[in-house]
Structures are given as structure tokens and as C-alpha cells.
């Protein structure tokens, strides 16, 4: 493996448990942002020490209801500090002129996850490999031995409502 691809290759595979199939805009696989942040922390160290963002700017465009977020994703890799410019935009003004209270968090998170993808994080999803069920099944096998470890939340809530002791119970989707 090329030294240039070392970082990419170490973070390109995605655990399917932290993805969601989305059936909007032609369909795509969404990756949980917290999962990406955990993986970045595992690779670089704690946020703010081994990686983070700096020079954050939010620019609102009143005529369109959009906000543009721009910043720099920085990370420590060996003895170097790398920097990647990141950006994203989002509508902050909802129907009826109401402001989305979470617009800043949403746009900053979107930009950061896109920035991590430039370093190779979850590249298998962005390269379309999650469209292939055989590939996804191989990743399930790799990350959790092929066992379905997803929780059936309906069973969990029902058991709690019935007062059952669920401390030693495995509740998986059926």
C-alpha cells in the first residue's frame, strides 16, 4: 500500500450498524455523524487536541434564506498537522419565515462529515459500495461476526412497560 493511501485505507470501511438507508432524493446511505466523530477520535485523538475545526464563519443570505458555513478541518497525522477547507449550506428560514433553531449545528455537522470524507472516512459508502448487498453483508460479518445486533426498540419498550426484567435479555429485530 502506498504511504499516501495509508490514512485513507485505515478509515475507508464503514460498520453498517451506523448507517441508515434514506429513500429521499433518489435514495442514499446516511452515515451517523457521531460514528464518524468517534472514528476520527480513534484515529487522531480527542476533538480539540488531535483534530477539530477552526476559523468558523456563518454567512446568512437573507434573500434566499440560506446560511453558508465555512471553516477549516485540522487533524494531526504523525508529526504533521493537516488542514482541509470545509463548507456547507442549509436553509435556516423555514416555511412561514420561522427560523430553524438547529441550523448552525446541522450545517456545521454536514460540513465536518464531508471534510472527514475527503480524508477517506467511510469512503466505501461515498464510492457506492453500500449499494451492493454482498458488500454490506461482508462488512456486517467483518464488524460483528454477521450477528444482527440491532435492537428492536418496540420489544424493549413493551417489556419495560410490562415491568419485565430485561437486564439479561437480548432484544434484536426479528
Task: Give the positions of each predicted feature.
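Positively charged, aromatic-enriched nucleic acid-contacting surfaces
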Residues: 31-141
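Membrane-interacting alpha-helical segments
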Residues: 5-11, 116, 147-149
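Interfaces that engage single-stranded nucleic acids at replication/repair/recombination sites
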Residues: 3, 136-174
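N-terminal, Lys/Arg- and Ser/Thr-rich interaction peptides
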Residues: 1-37
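Short secondary-structure junctions and interdomain/linker hinges
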Residues: 18, 47, 164-168
Amino acid at each position: 500500500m502506498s504511504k499516501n493511501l495509508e490514512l485513507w485505507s485505515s478509515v475507508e470501511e464503514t460498520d453498517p450498524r451506523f448507517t441508515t438507508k434514506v429513500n429521499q432524493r433518489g435514495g442514499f446511505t446516511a452515515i451517523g455523524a457521531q460514528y464518524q466523530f468517534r472514528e476520527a477520535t480513534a484515529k487522531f485523538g480527542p476533538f480539540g487536541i488531535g483534530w477539530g475545526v477552526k476559523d468558523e464563519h456563518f454567512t446568512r443570505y437573507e434573500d434566499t434564506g440560506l446560511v453558508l458555513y465555512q471553516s477549516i478541518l485540522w487533524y494531526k497525522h504523525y508529526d504533521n498537522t493537516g488542514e482541509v477547507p470545509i463548507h456547507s449550506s442549509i436553509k435556516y428560514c423555514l416555511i412561514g419565515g420561522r427560523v430553524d433553531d438547529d441550523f448552525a449545528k446541522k450545517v456545521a455537522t454536514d460540513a465536518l462529515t464531508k471534510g472527514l470524507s475527503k480524508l477517506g472516512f467511510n469512503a466505501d459508502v461515498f464510492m457506492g459500495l453500500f449499494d451492493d448487498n454482498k458488500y454490506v453483508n461482508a462488512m456486517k460479518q467483518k464488524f460483528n461476526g454477521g450477528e444482527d445486533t440491532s435492537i428492536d426498540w418496540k420489544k424493549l419498550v413493551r417489556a419495560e412497560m410490562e415491568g419485565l426484567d430485561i437486564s439479561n435479555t437480548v432484544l434484536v429485530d426479528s
